[in-house]
Amino acid sequence: MRCRRTGFLLVLTLLLALPAPASASTAGETIRLGPAKAGLRQLLSGPGERHVVRRAAGVRVRPGRATRRRSLAYFAQLSDPHVLDEASPARMEFLAGAGRAASHGYRPQEALTTQVLDSMVRAVNRHGVSGLRARGGRRAKLDFSVTTGDLSDNAQLNEARWYMRALEGGVLEPASGKPISAANPCHGATPEQVDRLNRAALERRYTGVQDHSDYPGAPSGAYMRFWDPDTGRAAGRYSRVRFPGLMDRAQQPFVAEGLRTPWYSVMGNHDQQRQGILSRPHAVLDRVSSGCQKTFPGIFDARTLAGRSAGSIFTSLAGARTLDVLRRDRRLVPPDPDRRVLSKRELRDMHAGPDRSHGLGLVSQSQNQRSAGAASYYAWSPRPGVRFISLDTVAEGGGPHGNVDHPQYRWLSSELRRNSSRKRPQLVVIFSHHPLRGLHSRVPDERMGPCSPRRPAQCDADPRRSTPVHSGLGGRQPLRALLLRHPSVVAMVSGHSHQNHVEPFARADGRGAFWQVVTASHIDFPQQSRLLQLMDNRDGTLSLYGTALDHAAPTPAPRAGTDASAFSSLQLASLSRTLSTPRKGSAIGSRGRRGDRNVELLVRDPRRLGG
């Protein structure tokens, strides 16, 4: 893993990032799990899956709609890429033994998130024309793409820059760690150590838990939770699986294709909070995240924290006794000031852009003014007759679960009332990171504490009172009840849960329903996105088609034992998908049932309900 990188290798890297082959949707071809071979679960091509027809309450299915229907909107949903800096001191992989609450602190495929996102972008681009035909054989062009949150994993500046490059296109450099300088110090390092760290940074070498030579002398058990692809050393399923040079290869630049459509961004909890849960400053994480000291697995026993909540675990890390143990497990790594947490204003500005094509530039002037620039919800109509509304469901007071604060709830209610009062109301599709069942945080935004010049990030920038906060299903004035009051709402499209799931929410008076569509993540199996198309069947019903989309990387991954130093970015993405597969015999619930993947979701056309 200590191979030097030359200009020749950079050129080779760029040449190997070739355009992806045409990517079939899962309606034409699926990926199925095969047997394990040489320690890796094999992935095989399988037959496509037809769209399962599902009806909301009160819908009569009439034959012949395929010859009558008209496309109203065709768009792609990408969710939960979790682009991450796997070398960051803020990753805290040493907590891997703390149980379920810390289970996402390490994944064997986590160094490959930028390549997976690029591979997914390539797949979306291959579907610029719909595979579904409307009346007269017409096929719609892709109107836009939407990212429903958790583009980054740890709310870091460098992670945000990486996903922006993946979505916009151009040369993407996924390595972190910069040479030591007066502006990027490593206090206490000897001249020899400074020289070693600077060489590692300049040569884009990986430093972290997946290179066991980076923390020699640790107790033998400390290495077993973390797969080292150079040696194949690890406990469990990837023991003896080798891909020499993989971790260094993952740090090398490649050419990202970039989306060919406008794309709109929805806020997720990992985009704004460390580990997706920490909204306030943390005594340990904030001090070490940009510096040159990383806590590696060692004498600290994370099993002592098993059974605790994630919040309790992170609180305990600031205790004097725990800090003393953690200091003894620290090793030097190249520092990087770009590992700092982004402020919400910075995040908004990155996505606003002069053309406002990424959504956050579409926040209304009144909401901008009242929120002091903190509002991150907006509405737009790229096609006549359909209104899209993007919500910010991040519970800024902390925690992984979402809510809708009261100012946003009032704005949404006003948007829906205004639409309902039109002579011909537009159909409404809601986008959010959290699905309704994930909106149950009762924590107010004020828990973060106010922003100040000395504290521009990890603070409550909105001067308005957030309470009462609104849940998805329970409590007073839940979001479901608000959406059901307006028949024009036909769908809510979300992510967060890392699994495919579809369910209807019907109105008690029988006046239609709306569909909740939840799509899997890019970081965990099956690493899918979704193509969505809203159709007017011209018989009093609408169809929302959802088609699961695999990313463009080859289905079979490179063979175990192959030298990874010359892998293309698509081969890296293919290997990521294979590494993310569930254990043999374990459930694959993240794929969902047949009725959660490729679906035709029928609902009564609210424009024809009358009065």
Which residues make up each language-model segment?
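Secretory targeting and sorting signals
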Residues: 2-24
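Metal-dependent phosphoesterase/phosphodiesterase active-site architecture
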Residues: 25-136, 143-146, 187-247, 254, ...
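Histidine-centered catalytic micro-motifs
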Residues: 81-83, 431-437, 490-502
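Catalytic cores of eukaryotic secretory-pathway lumenal/extracellular enzymes that build
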Residues: 145-146, 154, 159-166, 171, ...
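Short, well-ordered beta-to-alpha junction loops that form the rim of enzyme active sites
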Residues: 149-150, 268-270, 392-393, 431-435, ...
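Short, proline-enriched alpha-helix->beta-strand connector loops that line the catalytic pocket
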Residues: 258-262, 488, 512
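Short acidic, glycine-rich surface-loop motifs adjacent to enzyme active sites
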Residues: 419-440
